[in-house]
Amino acid sequence: VRSTLPFISLLIAISCGSLFFRLGSLPLSGADEPRYARIAQEMRDQGSWATPLLQGKPWLEKPPLYYWITAPFYSIFEIKETAARFGPALCALITAISVFWLGSGLWSRQTGLIGASILLTSIGFVGFGRGASTDMPFTCCFTLSMAILARGVALPGQRAARPHMPASGRDARAPGWKILFAYVFLGLAILGKGPVAIVLAFGIGLCFWFLDEQGTDLNSWRIVQGLALTAAVSVPWFWLVFHRNGFAFVSTFFINHNIARYATGIHHHSEPFLYYLPVLLALLFPWSGWFPLFLSKSPLKEIRRWRQWDPRMIFLICWFLVPVIFFSFSDSKLAGYILPSLPPLALILGIYASRAIKGTIEKFRLRAAGVLHLMFSASVAVAAPFFFQKEYGGNWKIGLLLGITILVPAFFTFGFTIKGKCIRAFSATVLQSLILIFFVTQFAFPLLGAYYSTREIAHRALELRSPGEPILTYRFFQHSLYYYTGYQVETQLDDKESLVQFARRHPDFLVVTKAEGMKEITGMKEISASPLGEQGNLRLLKIRDSKFEIRN
């Protein structure tokens, strides 16, 4: 244990820079963060640990693991945003440590450390780790499950049908009862996101067993006892919620948010079949530039030799590919769906990086990685100012600053790879990611918060609101506005006539709208509008019925 403490300490230090630094500085944003945070708060406040509640009403779309993890942190942290995100960030760190544990057990501590470091500094993984959502708790539990399973069934010593694979004394031991922990964490993964955990685990296990030419004794998998444990962990919650909510739970959770979400575009997340190819490059950035380490001078020969592949690598490849392929066939596609594929991919890349450090792979691979990494970094750096100019009100200077933080370390990585100094190139890429995260949190977060959240304008509305005065939105909807006003937004209006009718019933009220909506409102003769504040593209107005104003 002592020999692993320095490695764990280093991973914790990296996570402090990538995951926990200024964790609560960005307001809760998007559709999911405010809702999930509120549900966790209500779970703690009302003590309803079975049925998730939103404004006192059952919220049956997702299982409870995120809420269970998050609720206690509201008693620890004063900053709500930190409380809402600390659980997923902690899960991300545990995921990385499990990658280190798996890499150390199947290869070496160096390999495990490199794979875990790659994961902790991949921008997409960090982004989900810093978000208040169900994706990272699910990925954490699923990774723990697959890591335990891999160490139990993918060790060379377990393969009676693999005489060419040497087995050390340690590797030759049967996994025994310890493999049952994989099924416990699989049950927790089901409580993280639903039955998709079973589907992915079954696909990975079947794929590995088939490609490994049935080289594993299935008795060592302890499937019957394991699935009984999985059911014991997960089924009680499903039964309890069904007992309390009836077929509304079946309809909402299983049919709508699992079957229909996968088979149809009902939730408006339809994307092309190859959607996840560019998504993978983005999620693993800046490490996606290191993919040339996988190159081979004779790739077809390597594929034809698949029967001689290392079973450890076969397991990781199956683990990586199954979620990507499964969700590529789904009509609904979101980047977070393939988050479980990142841990094995990071470890595979760590294996090849470790080989490059030892000098056991061709030098052209490392040089090609340096070139591609520089190309990817330069592309992002050049695009950043234009993107910020277009999307964020002309704030190109922030994009330029971020571009510089990406490009300068990339040149160092490039130089080190050309000289064959792999350790320095690896370290430069880690620093590139950490520096980028630092500058994003320091300089981009205030701007992103203004455009993707409503914290400032919500607080302004509550500050200026008269007792009993309604708050509503016009041609605009944002979940965070409901969250930051304490769910005091009365209604959402989408046309001028509805706004005029509301003004006749309520002489004074506040409206949050976009800049375009403000132009419409100020041009209406039936009402009088006074601007009270703004945040990004949002405007806060006080509305009065013109007839009421004349009478007074």
Stretches found by the model and what they are:
Residues L180, V184, F294-S546, N552:
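Membrane-embedded architecture of ER/inner-membrane glycosylation machinery
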Residues R2-E362, Q535-N537:
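Membrane-integral, polyisoprenol-dependent glycosyltransferases
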